[in-house]
């Protein structure tokens, strides 16, 4: 089972040189530690609970290809590092008119994810589509967003279906866990309880206007 500590350890090994990595990866790891130390000075915080929540979700996400088909995914440390960055760092939710922090019913500040966009470039056969499919499912039904709209987009609909079809197969292979959270058909994955959906779309489609996107995977 992946833990936040695995992501920390990966970043430490990259910074120390134990893991050979490109410049952008090294900079990302250095930024990670800098933000942990200095982020609160500018309103950036790391929420370990949020980070661990998405990692725990992957305990129910199965492999969909190869000899490991049906078995739970074991996230590699670099997968974990990506996920805790995206889901762990938060900033206060600010009112766009008053520029003041928005408070919850208990009078505490509400927080939202710091990062709204991420770019991930890896070599083939490194489970990029699998990781993306898991993120798509998480954002559809485990992120606490009612009416969540998640889209897998590409130049053509067939390309967009790669991540989507993997996500559908994950649900089929995990009927006692993911199968209880989601329903699926040819057009979408959905969660009736929250009115959320996950669909593939082509970038040249005529129906892209007006989408209220909670998560887009391109």
Predicted regions and their residues:
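Phosphate/NTP-binding elements of NTP-utilizing enzymes
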Residues: 2-218
């Amino acid at each position: 089972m992946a833990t936040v500590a695995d992501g920390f350890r990966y970043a430490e090994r990259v910074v120390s040189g134990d893991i050979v990595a490109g410049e952008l990866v090294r900079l990302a790891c250095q930024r990670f530690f800098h933000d942990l130390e200095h982020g609160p000075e500018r309103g950036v915080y790391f929420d370990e609970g949020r980070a661990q929540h998405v990692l725990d979700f992957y305990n129910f996400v199965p492999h969909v290809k190869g000899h490991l088909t049906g078995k739970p995914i074991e996230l590699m440390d670099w997968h974990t590092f990506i996920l805790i960055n995206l889901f762990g760092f938060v900033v206060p939710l600010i009112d766009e008119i008053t520029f003041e922090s928005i408070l919850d019913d208990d009078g505490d500040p509400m927080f939202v994810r710091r990062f709204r966009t991420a770019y991930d470039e890896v070599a083939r056969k490194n489970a990029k589509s699998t990781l993306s499919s898991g993120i798509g499912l998480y954002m559809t039904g485990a992120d606490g967003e009612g009416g969540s709209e998640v889209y897998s987009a590409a130049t053509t609909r067939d390309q967009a279906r790669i991540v989507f079809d993997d996500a559908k197969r994950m649900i089929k292979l995990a009927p006692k866990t993911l199968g209880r959270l989601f329903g699926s058909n040819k057009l979408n994955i959905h969660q009736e309880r929250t009115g959320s959906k996950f669909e593939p779309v082509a970038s040249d489609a005529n129906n892209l206007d007006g989408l209220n996107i909670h998560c887009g995977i391109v």
